[in-house]
Amino acid sequence: MLVSIVVPVYNEEENIAIFYNAVTKVMSGLSYEYELIYVDDGSTDSSVVILREIAKLDARVKVVLLARNFGHQTALTCGLDYAKGDAVITMDGDMQHPPALIPELIRLWENGYDVVRTIRDSTEDASWAKSFTSKYYYKLMNKMADVPIVEGGSDFRLMNRKSLE
C-alpha cells in the first residue's frame, strides 16, 4: 500500500532538509511505500532549488510548482490532486506538525478510520492576544456554522482514498 504525504511550501528553504530527513527517518521504520509531494506555492527564496535537488536524489519525492502564491489551502488541494496513495497525509513543512506522529495516524487508519485529524492541545507559544482572539473566533464560527468547528484543528491529518473521492 502507498502513503502519500502532501506538503505545501512557501519560502521554507531553512526547513526543507530538516523536514525531509525527519519524514524519511519516520517512514523508514514503517512497512509502507510512500511518496512525498511538495507543492511550492510561489516561493521567492531557494525552496524550489532545494526541492528539485532532493527530488533528483529520491524518486519518492515529487515537486509541484504553482505559478504564483495562491495560498496555503490551494497548495494543499493541488497536492491532494496529485496524491496517488491509499492514505494521504497533509502536513506543513515547517516542523509545526511533528513527523514523529505519522505512525500514530497510520495506526489509526489501519484500525479502520477513514479520516484521522490532529488538534493542537497547547497554546503556550501563543501570545495572550492570539489565544483570546482564537478562542472567540471559534465561538463565533460555531454559532454561525451548521457543522461544528473544532478549536485547535489543523491541516495535519490522514485521509483514506475513499474519503478523498
Where are these regions (language model features)?
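Short, well-formed alpha-helical segments that are part of the catalytic scaffolds
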Residues: 12-27
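Acidic helix N-cap motif at the loop->helix transition within catalytic regions
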Residues: 14-18, 44-54
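Acceptor/aglycone-binding surface of glycosyltransferases and processive sugar-polymer synthases
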Residues: 53, 64-68, 72-82, 87, ...
